[in-house]
Design a protein with these regions (language model features):
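Charged, low-complexity intrinsically disordered terminal segments
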Residues: 3-223
Length: 223
């Protein structure tokens, strides 16, 4: 269930709201992306996260090594660490590794378990049209609050704790989903991962399609 959600047609629209929510962090900031690239977008986020880390906010960044192989490196990790920001590399790239295709395609930012961002927008300047790669860049994003945001926080914590020696504390504030919320709709936060062999996404899509009575709309860059 949700208190409020917002849909963004472009990364350009999402980015200012994301920065405002980062500035509001009081307990923790979780960042998990397939691609992180230095530039206007990332530098603005790092400036805020560094200040928050100095204030005692727990800031954690997780990125996919293959997705960010040409845009983010050990020196960037070192700089984050020096600023008090914890950082984990998902599945470090090893040539001829049998695990090469096990990638973290998640794109999400969570603040205090009360607000979360996700969608198709990575942390790179082309996603906010500050840099042109293939013409005007179109990727959607969304912002959720309340229980769905807490769900994203739990997803992050589970993945982080599997790959880091600095686990997310058990006592962190996650909204109790049993607490009633004023809603006018329904949002379910879910994920697939190497720890889940049930193909959650596939089953959900098939279930939704099976219940369709008039139409089914798809929006995807890949078929």
């Amino acid at each position: 269930m949700y208190k409020r959600q917002k849909y963004y047609r472009l990364g350009d629209e999402l980015f200012p709201d994301m920065l405002n929510d980062l500035r509001s962090a009081e307990e923790y900031i979780f960042v998990e992306y397939f691609i992180i690239a230095n530039g206007v977008m990332w530098n603005a986020m790092v400036d805020i996260m560094s200040e928050k880390a100095r204030q005692g906010v727990d800031v954690r960044v997780m990125y996919d090594d293959l997705g960010s192989i040409s845009t983010f490196n050990a020196n960037d990790v070192r700089q984050l660490t020096e600023r008090g920001i914890k950082c984990v590399t998902f599945n470090p790239f090893v040539v001829l590794s049998g695990n090469l295709n096990y990638r973290d395609h998640r794109k999400m930012l969570i603040v205090d378990g009360r607000v979360a961002y996700s969608g198709g927008i990575n942390i790179a300047d082309e996603y906010i049209n500050q840099k042109e790669r293939f013409g005007h860049w179109k990727d959607i994003g969304f912002r959720v609050t309340g229980t769905p945001a807490a769900g994203y926080a739990r997803m992050f914590a589970g993945f982080w704790n599997a790959f880091s020696k600095q686990p997310v504390p058990d006592g962190y504030t996650f909204i109790d989903p049993s607490i009633p919320e004023k809603t006018d709709g329904y949002v379910l936060s879910y994920c697939d991962s190497p720890f889940n062999a049930d193909s959650t996404s596939t089953k959900l899509f098939i279930d939704l399609l099976s219940q369709a009575t008039e139409y089914a709309w798809f929006c995807t860059p890949y078929l």
